[in-house]
Amino acid sequence: MRFVDEATITVRAGNGGNGCVSFRREKFVPRGGPDGGDGGDGGSVILRASNRLLSLYDFRLQRNYEAPNGQGGMGSQCHGRKGDDLTVELPVGTQIYEVTEDGETLLCDLSDPETVFVVAQGGRGGKGNEHFKSSTNRAPRFAQKGETGEVRSLRLELKILADAGLLGLPNAGKSTFISKVSAARPKIAAYPFTTLIPNLGVMIDDADPEQRLVIADIPGLIEGAHTGQGLGHRFLKHVERTRFLVHILSVEDVSLDSPDGPWSGFDLINEELVRFDADLGQRVQLQVVNKIDLRDPEDVQALRDRAAADGRTVHFMSALTGEGVEDVVAEMWRMRDELDIHEALVRLRETEEFDEEESDIEVIWVRE
């Protein structure tokens, strides 16, 4: 599936139906008076967050969305039918901006599944001439026109909502890893910046197929990413919506003889994260050294010993041969489950604190 994280669309709500000018005409009722019905309201455009979608690609193909108009009023006080609302499904994590001549305004953030937002309100139907009769005008020959529905130009921006975000320097083997542990098929080649757009993969627990772990393969980051270098801003925004990070470094970028230390590659990217958003520096992180098949076992063991001496938890694997991959995957599942428990405890604590608060509303019971 091609991943698209930005799109521009136009939404148009339906116009309200016009009120009707009509007079009652029946046998034995020579002066029946006005009986024009009201027009129906126009349909609204509603946005809904859906887990079924993972990209904004469809919105590059269809850019205009229009809800039906309301039906006009009819005689015998018959009201027009309301236009059906148009519901547009968007991926969870989509931010909606209204584009005007003065700039952009954030309207809503569809960060939770099934969140709905009325982005364009349908026009109200006009009133029929029966509403305008009076003591001085017993037979009004006019009715109210329906209101025009709202029209908005929107910019959609998707920030990936994933359990794990894969990040690291270019050519670290992130795409190879996600292709091994999921059904994702990203472009893989032996040169930097092979991945130019984020890729999504889903790991399914064999013991419980209902348990899934969504992985986002973030394109490689370089020094200066927080200032936009190497499309850094465009890639870093996706890191914000991940629950924990899997930081992958190629063994080619790890050297015991480096003056900055063997783990300088990890430190470089972490510094870019902090400069972009201080909260990202506190994100739970799993550090992995990949491509160990390119080094002798003795060299890899020396790196393991150095990590232990530095008090650093580093996993070693080869995504190409599969060595060490199972251990990394097991640790990812453990981190996800641990975060689930932590978030549940936080919600429980918030609920308990809320229950303990004294209400300043006095309730009086009345028996009828």
From Swiss-Prot:
Residues 162-337 form the OBG-type G domain. Its cofactor is Mg(2+). GO terms for cellular component: cytoplasm. Its EC number is 3.6.5.-. GO terms for biological process: ribosome biogenesis. The keyword DNA damage does not apply. InterPro entries: G_OBG, GTP-bd, GTP-bd_Obg/CgtA, GTP1-OBG_CS, GTP1_OBG_dom, GTP1_OBG_dom_sf, OBG_GTPase, P-loop_NTPase. It is found in: Cytoplasm. One of its GO terms (molecular function) is GTP binding. It comes from the Bacteria. Its main location: cytoplasm. The keyword Cytoplasm applies. Keywords: Cytoplasm, GTP-binding, Hydrolase, Magnesium, Metal-binding, Nucleotide-binding. Residues 1-161 form the Obg domain. Mg(2+) binds at residues 175, 195. GTP binds at residues 168-175, 193-197, 217-220, 290-293, 318-320. Pfam families: GTP1_OBG, MMR_HSR1. Disulfide bonds: none annotated. An essential GTPase which binds GTP, GDP and possibly (p)ppGpp with moderate affinity, with high nucleotide exchange rates and a fairly low GTP hydrolysis rate. Plays a role in control of the cell cycle, stress response, ribosome biogenesis and in those bacteria that undergo differentiation, in morphogenesis control. PANTHER family: DEVELOPMENTALLY REGULATED GTP-BINDING PROTEIN-RELATED, MITOCHONDRIAL RIBOSOME-ASSOCIATED GTPASE 2. Belongs to the TRAFAC class OBG-HflX-like GTPase superfamily. OBG GTPase family. Monomer. This is GTPase Obg. The gene is obg.
